[in-house]
Amino acid sequence: MRPVINYDELLKKIPYKFAIPIAAAKRAENLKEFAKPYVETWDNNYVSIALKELSEGYIRIKNEEILKVLIPNVK
């Protein structure tokens, strides 16, 4: 059974829409190189596991304060 990841909910936790796939891809690479997943799942898709870890808060984006510059200031 695939983990259900709601991207809109994930954007509420991490407001950097371009950083989420990069962080998930880096974590998926680590999982592919035999890192232990932080969540229990039957899925073997590394990207799905990485996104689930991000959504549950097991992993986070480093230097998040640098990314605050990327949030648009719309008036």
From Swiss-Prot:
Gene Ontology cellular-component terms listed: DNA-directed RNA polymerase complex
Matches recorded under SUPFAM superfamilies: RPB6/omega subunit-like
Catalytic reactions on record: RNA(n) + a ribonucleoside 5'-triphosphate = RNA(n+1) + diphosphate
Enzyme Commission number(s): 2.7.7.6
Keywords: DNA-directed RNA polymerase, Nucleotidyltransferase, Transcription, Transferase
Gene Ontology MF terms in the entry: DNA binding; DNA-directed RNA polymerase activity
Keyword Transferase set for record: yes
Keyword Ribonucleoprotein belongs to the record: no
InterPro entries xref list: DNA-dir_RNA_pol_omega, Pol_omega/Rpo6/RPB6, RPB6/omega-like_sf
A Pfam family reported for this protein in Swiss-Prot or TrEMBL: RNA_pol_Rpb6
GO biological processes: DNA-templated transcription
Record's function text: Promotes RNA polymerase assembly. Latches the N- and C-terminal regions of the beta' subunit thereby facilitating its interaction with the beta and alpha subunits.
NCBIfam families (UniProt xref): rpoZ (TIGR00690)
Stated family: Belongs to the RNA polymerase subunit omega family.
Assembly behavior: The RNAP catalytic core consists of 2 alpha, 1 beta, 1 beta' and 1 omega subunit. When a sigma factor is associated with the core the holoenzyme is formed, which can initiate transcription.
Protein name, as recorded: DNA-directed RNA polymerase subunit omega
Source species of the chain: Thermosipho africanus (strain TCF52B)
